[in-house]
């Protein structure tokens, strides 16, 4: 059997083997992945993984309540942290998104209830994706992106959201010969669907 081709470093390999595509049903981990995907806009994912520990420290290990309460002094502290990504609009967006995240929790009981509701609480396997062909965005990610933006989220475009859906296991985009593809399918409630307005 062969794994997916994109993990090119040991750190990337660990992320592929133990995180990417594994269904997340915990709000804090959903928030962490969404923040990391938002930070990644325009950057490489490997850079984000390399800075992940610094990012975690800057954002109180993605404590949603803590991040939602951040003020100017917290932003300045993050901006001055050595090794941290220093693009202020993204930092401000994470703080903004924490507050929006909490509003969703209040409305739906949890963010997981909200986002998994878009897939009827199933992990999607799209036609042709197990052959190694998957898009940067699709109809599902566009719909979720639009809804999140209407709820006040920032830096959550369709491409970012598609990556989030892959990472958090709402879509299983591992190749069919990758052991992770089969492992996830054994434990997840899956549904096979035709492609959805892909780009």
Residue spans of the language-model regions?
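HhH-family (HhH-GPD) DNA N-glycosylase catalytic core used in base-excision repair
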Residues: 1-199
């Amino acid at each position: 059997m062969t794994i997916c081709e994109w993990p090119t470093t040991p750190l990337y390999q660990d992320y592929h083997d133990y995180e990417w595509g594994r269904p997340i049903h915990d709000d804090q981990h959903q928030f962490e992945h969404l923040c990391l995907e938002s930070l990644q806009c325009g950057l490489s994912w490997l850079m984000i993984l390399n800075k992940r520990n610094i990012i975690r420290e800057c954002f109180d290990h993605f404590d949603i309540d803590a991040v939602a309460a951040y003020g100017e002094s917290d932003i300045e502290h993050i901006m001055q942290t050595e090794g941290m990504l220093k693009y202020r609009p993204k930092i401000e967006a994470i703080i903004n998104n924490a507050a929006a995240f909490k509003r969703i929790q209040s409305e739906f009981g949890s963010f997981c209830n909200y986002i998994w509701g878009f897939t009827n609480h199933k992990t999607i396997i799209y036609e042709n994706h197990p052959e190694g062909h998957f898009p940067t965005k699709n109809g599902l990610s566009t719909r979720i992106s639009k809804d999140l933006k209407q709820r006040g989220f920032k830096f959550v475009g369709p491409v970012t959201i598609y990556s989030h859906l892959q990472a958090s296991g709402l879509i299983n985009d591992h190749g069919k010969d990758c052991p992770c593809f089969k492992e996830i399918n054994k434990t997840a409630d899956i549904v096979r669907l035709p492609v959805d307005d892909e780009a």
